[in-house]
UniProtKB/Swiss-Prot annotation:
It comes from the Bacteria. Disulfide bonds: none annotated. The keyword NADP applies. Substrate binds at N101, S127, G128, G129, H185, N186, Y190, K259, R286, R444, H450. Belongs to the 6-phosphogluconate dehydrogenase family. Keywords: Gluconate utilization, NADP, Oxidoreductase, Pentose shunt. Its EC number is 1.1.1.44. NADP(+) binds at G9, L10, A11, V12, M13, G14, N32, R33, S34, V73, K74, A75, N101. Pathway: Carbohydrate degradation; pentose phosphate pathway; D-ribulose 5-phosphate from D-glucose 6-phosphate (oxidative stage): step 3/3. The gene is gnd. One of its GO terms (molecular function) is phosphogluconate dehydrogenase (decarboxylating) activity. This is 6-phosphogluconate dehydrogenase, decarboxylating.
Amino acid sequence: MTQQIGVVGLAVMGKNLAWNIESRGYSVSVYNRSRQKTDEMVKESPGREIYPTYSLEEFVESLEKPRKILLMVKAGPATDATIDGLLPLLDDDDILIDGGNTNYQDTIRRNKALAESSINFIGMGVSGGEIGALTGPSLMPGGQKDAYNKVSDILDAIAAKAQDGASCVTYIGPNGAGHYVKMVHNGIEYADMQLIAESYAMMKDLLGMSHKEISQTFKEWNAGELESYLIEITGDIFNKLDDDNEALVEKILDTAGQKGTGKWTSINALELGVPLTIITESVFARFISSIKEERVTASKSLKGPKAHFEGDKKTFLEKIRKALYMSKICSYAQGFAQMRKASEDNEWNLKLGELAMIWREGCIIRAQFLQKIKDAYDNNENLQNLLLDPYFKNIVMEYQDALREVVATSVYNGVPTPGFSASINYYDSYRSEDLPANLIQAQRDYFGAHTYERKDREGIFHTQWVEE
């Protein structure tokens, strides 16, 4: 008997996705390069329609045609090697789905190469971590549309379900569109986390709040417009005590790791010529956190103000909340503007409102306000920037004073807030009819004869700035 779908790669994500698929009524063949992992999964799957195979030949032969194969192997050369091993065994119109954390440019390359061999290739972003993989992730598949249609029932079944019952999966677009959207999703995640961390820094270092007070504050914020998975878990984190009955989070070394997708997002923004300042500052913040020894040394010799607050703490705490929400809006505005530009350049025809909808459950950035983003694009599918939508425009105009005060207070007290600072600078730059770039262009013309345009007349101009 042949199975309906196969999974290659049985690390925690592949294993959990295989179990998720099987739990929805599909029979699953599994294969792993290491026989041990396959045997372990079989032992952990009594009574389930999980069928082990121990060679790629056996694996491919075990699948019904057209074959549907989900690759959950390490991104990069390992994915290429797995595809190279499978390719001679496949038939025309078989479907490979790469669910790894893959660079979208690799997906474009693989999609093109496999199409020349009459093999369909779907690059699919998977968000939600190991728990989401098992119970329902947010899925972002891109590739051939007809191939997606052949696997859409399975993907719809395993995806997370929003409160209205909709599955958190949709066809994203051709070739690398799915992995591209997942990349930007991860970049937005970096910014969300950094902005929350800066809020915590203000609470702790400026307002002198205890871990219990901080936990309660985040729990209260999660009951309002900031409701989201990351705010929810932050409240939980500050409640967790260690063996000494002290806040565990305060014992964790302050060096933040990363897998590189935030950096990819920032690099792509530079290539597109799109301002992505908040996400990029969040990436840099992780970089500077990683040079712990340098910071310890610098802290002993580079002096600055000592944080001191004399105002009403409750009032200022509300300003931090508003600053966080406005900065979050600015970050998403930048991320969605980046996806809009990439969609135009690559002819992907991304449905930006639909992207917000599939992030409502299953993924790390799930949040209440994603519905507001969907509403914004429903009202105007050609919306240039989320800040121009009536709802978001009203919020940022109302909350800007709070963000300005939070940034000014943080600077005056020496509390670093690169994400908040980038947010208000982006807002002010975006709303400026005139920026001092005219001087930069004059300088470029002065030293390099790069020419310039004028406001008052048509044409391209060059000036001899100093008479010989």
